[in-house]
UniProtKB/Swiss-Prot annotation:
Keywords: Activator, Transcription, Transcription regulation. Regulatory peptide encoded by the primary transcript (pri-miR171b) of the microRNA miR171b that enhances the accumulation of its corresponding mature miRNA. Acts probably as a transcriptional activator of its corresponding pri-miRNA. Has no effect on the accumulation of other miRNAs. Addition of synthetic miPEP171b increases the abundance of miR171b, with consequent reduction of lateral root formation. It comes from Medicago truncatula. It comes from the Eukaryota. The lineage of its organism: Eukaryota, Viridiplantae, Streptophyta, Embryophyta, Tracheophyta. One of its GO terms (biological process) is negative regulation of lateral root development. Lateral root initiations. This is Peptide encoded by miPEP171b.
Length: 20
């Protein structure tokens, strides 16, 4: 589903920002 994919992408984005 698009919403699930979007939330998954947002989670990855947050993880990257958190690590940086």
């Amino acid at each position: 589903m698009l919403l699930h994919r979007l939330s998954k992408f947002c989670k990855i984005e947050r993880d990257i920002v958190y690590i940086s």
